[in-house]
């Protein structure tokens, strides 16, 4: 991991990863998107809903509100209760004169501390929730919980191949050469190259594969970006170590496989490329079926399979530890 820069009060991190396989960077991205422990709204009870929004959508919208509580704040998570109650006013016709825009500030918080629903980080304004028409009412209760799968604390987690400036210059000269001495045509082709074709001029290793990546991470505001990257690397390391403990199944003719119902593409793709680099006869991974939680890594090698897996573990863990040391 190269040096990194922080912005937006520490909630955005930009860095570069060098001499790593694309599967490793993508694995980090996948963990950041859906495997970081996150405090969420759960146990939603809809006691009254006369709006046009169906119950399922209302429940989903409540659960999507970002919570300004960290997973380690056990007391806050346990004792906080959330309620939204908006009934028609006690007027003779039980109607309002105009519609009402409900925001996150309209949720009543009963717990150890207020302000647990995040505001818009950039505008410092409450989040828009829904519009309530004059004759409509709503009453919702909920609590907090911690989820480790399928939730996210980031609004940006992405990477791209790093552009090799020397290669880009050569490619650009080649791209604009057909224009000859026509300055207008050269300028147009140069603009096209800078806006699009330059993406092909990425840094490559000796085997022509990308090895240098620009990585961007932005937190929605609960946990700083630097801490999120550290958590992702820690989780990745643990997943690697756990996967390597699975039994190796032996087949005929120096064929071996490892099956797991706990992991998928994150570990499978990384195992495939790092084992491939050991010059084995064959290696692949596959997800048995999209609806079945099973991933199989299969390889053929004259080398003892235990040594192959141990080398994979050493290299993969070293990649994670390089991040932990850098941040």
Pin down the residues of each PLM region.
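Protein-protein interaction/assembly regions in multi-subunit complexes
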Residues: 1-327
């Amino acid at each position: 991991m190269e040096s990194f820069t922080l912005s937006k009060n520490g909630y955005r991190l930009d860095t570069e990863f060098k001499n790593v396989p694309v599967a490793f960077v993508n694995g980090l991205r996948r963990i950041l998107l859906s495997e970081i422990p996150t405090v969420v709204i759960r146990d939603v009870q809809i006691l009254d809903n006369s709006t046009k929004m169906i119950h399922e959508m209302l429940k989903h919208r409540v659960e999507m509100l970002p919570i300004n509580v960290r997973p380690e704040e056990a007391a806050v998570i346990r004792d906080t209760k959330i309620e939204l109650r908006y009934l028609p006013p006690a007027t003779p016709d039980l109607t309002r004169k105009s519609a009402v825009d409900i925001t996150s500030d309209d949720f009543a918080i009963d717990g150890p501390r207020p302000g647990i629903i995040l505001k818009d980080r950039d505008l410092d304004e409450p989040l828009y929730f829904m519009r309530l028409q004059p004759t409509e009412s709503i009453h919702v209760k909920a609590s907090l919980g911690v989820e480790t799968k399928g939730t996210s604390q980031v609004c940006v987690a992405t990477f791209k191949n790093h552009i090799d400036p020397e290669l880009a210059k050569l490619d650009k000269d080649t791209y604009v050469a057909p224009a000859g001495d026509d300055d207008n045509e050269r300028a147009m082709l140069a603009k096209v190259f800078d806006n699009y074709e330059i993406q092909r001029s990425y840094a490559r290793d000796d085997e022509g594969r990308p090895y240098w990546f620009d990585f961007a991470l932005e937190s929605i505001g609960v946990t700083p970006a630097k801490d999120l990257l550290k958590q992702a690397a820690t989780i990745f390391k643990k997943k690697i170590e756990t996967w390597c403990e699975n039994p190796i199944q032996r087949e005929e003719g120096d064929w071996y496989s490892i099956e797991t119902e706990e992991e998928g593409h994150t570990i499978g793709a990384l195992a495939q490329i790092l084992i491939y680099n050991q010059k084995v006869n064959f290696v692949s991974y596959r997800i048995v079926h999209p609806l079945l939680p099973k991933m199989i890594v299969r390889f053929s090698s004259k080398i003892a399979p235990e040594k192959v897996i141990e080398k994979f573990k050493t290299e993969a863990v070293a990649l994670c530890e390089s991040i932990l040391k850098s941040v």
